[in-house]
Amino acid sequence: CNAIENCSKPVFALINGTALGGGFELALSAHFRVATASAKIGLPEIHLGLLPGSGGTQRLPRIIGADKALKMMLNGQPVSAGEGLASGVIDRVEESGELISASMDFMLETTAGKHPRIPTRERTEGLQDEAANHVSIGEHRNTWQKKGKGLYSPFQIIDCVEKALSTPFEEGLKYERESFARCLESPQRKGLIHAFFAERRCSCLL
């Protein structure tokens, strides 16, 4: 992801279908994201007792702020391309389905200087309202303290997003890696993984 983000040429992520977890985290490292109208994006790692990796907890808040980023990560459900466009994480939605053609048009606009190439780690739109971000962190933490007893990853996700808002990118990325490792070792993660595969096996029998 860092290699993509650091590329000196504009990098476009074209999203057709569903980009969840690692696929969306990869798209976040691109400089621009173009999606079809039917596309879905999301970060469902919480359902497995994990947190978004590859810089997902650090890049998304820099674009859309703490509240929207936390809702996506803590809910774990896919959102539509239209919702992504409204939040700012998707740069363009192609209604006709001609994704490559639309992306080429966007690329030409970029080379003409209409859309500056800014690495996601350097984006600051989501960091501007410090007070709102601080309030959002507190509200989400309080909510999960009430309903998330016995769970581990929601609080790690909140802590990672808080780091994204208050520390340099590399420091936040290091914290994310350490938090991911802690989640991997948690009994909650092991239980949720077991439940996930048990549910899939049961569905095959129906």
Describe every region a protein language model picked out:
Residues E25-S29, K71-S179, F197-L206:
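Amphipathic alpha-helical segments at domain termini/boundaries
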Residues A3-L48, P52:
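Glycine-rich beta-to-alpha active-site loop
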